Amino acid sequence: MEFPVARNPQVKWKTGMLNEAEEMKDADFPEIRLFHVEHQLAPDGEKEDCVGKWVVCNPENLKDFSAVGFVFGRKLYKELSTPVGLIQSTWGGTHAESWTSMKVMENNPLYADVLKQYSKERVSREKDKCKVPATLWNGMIAPMVGYTVKGNIWYQGESNSVRYEKYQEVFTNLINSWRKEWNQPDMPFYFVQIAPHYKQPAGIREAQLKTWLSGLENIGMAVVTDAADSTDIHPRNKVAPGERLAAWALAKQYGKKIVYSGPLYKSMKVNGREITLDFEFAEGGLQTPGNEPVKGFFIAGNDARFYPAEAVINGSSITLSSTYVSAPVAVRYGYGTFFRVNLFNKAGLPAVPFRTDTFAPDTYYRLFADSEIRRFPEAWQLDHGKRLYFGYAQGVGCCAMLQVWKKTGDRRYFDYVEALSLIHISEPTR
């Protein structure tokens, strides 16, 4: 079987993989073969050929191969005992539009802005030429069209976060166009929801979630909230995304009776001051590591003021409440730039971040905290009486904070901290 490893920016082991030495001890697999497509820009049209060669899977050949892709292939091989081929076609820091055929984009208003901004005539810096629409489709994917593949794995989204409101349609169009080019209308497409990070808005992960839940056949999303690093958009934990992508393939394509997704929000019921949520993929019940208190839930009333919620697990459901919210109407879990969340199912897979509200995701919030904030704290104490630190964020999570000296009011520097309580305001105050 062959699986292309598409657009994963975290391609090289030498950039730092968690427990790399141990992983390399389990990296000799003569029946796993690797094909690494060399970088090739083609802004003027589709190429018929690309450069690369098949090599055996071993520690030396893996130095320049996708760690996530390798973990994915290794898991398939161990579970299925059958030869596996992995084709890596990747270029870090690129947009989904770079990997989409121009035939899809040229007459579609959805792409008008990016076609103008990144046209080959306007892009002069060498490092930006990979962002020209269709250039990587033309040079690194089109040459493989027609080659027999079992499916695709995809790890991308960071570079599209500035246009997250368009990403669901952009990504859906990419999937459908690849399937059409290969004449495989149900070709599997498994992707990683990008890890939470202080620079990444919640909207991009929400767009990925909506893509999964849109009704497209044979797609699946791996969640990596537990592997996230607030300061590194490319977390060093490559085993979690690789094995979770493999779980989708094993369950959906090979009929393995395994759990392939973490808890997914299903429904909500309000009862006075409490909200009870039910989840799918929660057979055997919900849990937290070491039965610690649940982190990451917020509730709000009609005023759109979200407060941390106390959470009580009851089997596959969870009940939320807050002393600050007397009539809750909305819930958010892990919905923000970066959050410490800890809800899992019995299979050890993390819950999917979500929100039940329709408040604008780019609404501004005023942040309140006490004067004891430290860099990257685990929590803040809600304190309306002290405003030594304040700032604005486009959602809950880890965000830029402007330090203001209490005595003089001087603004000194930005810091990155984790916000656990936000007060909604309609407009940012300058």
What are the residue ranges of the model-derived segments?
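Charged catalytic carboxylate motif
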Residues: V170, R244, Y364, V396, ...
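Structural helix-adjacent loops and short alpha-helical linkers that scaffold large soluble proteins
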Residues: A360-R366, V404-E418
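His/Met- and acidic-residue-enriched segments that coordinate or traffic transition-metal cofactors
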Residues: F376, W380-G385
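Well-ordered alpha-helical segments within folded domains of soluble proteins
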Residues: F390-W405, R430
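Short, solvent-exposed loop/edge-beta patches enriched in aromatic
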Residues: Y77-T82, C399, Q403-R412
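Residue-level detector of conserved catalytic or cofactor/ligand-binding positions
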Residues: I423-T429
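Cell-envelope and extracellular/periplasmic
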Residues: M1-F359
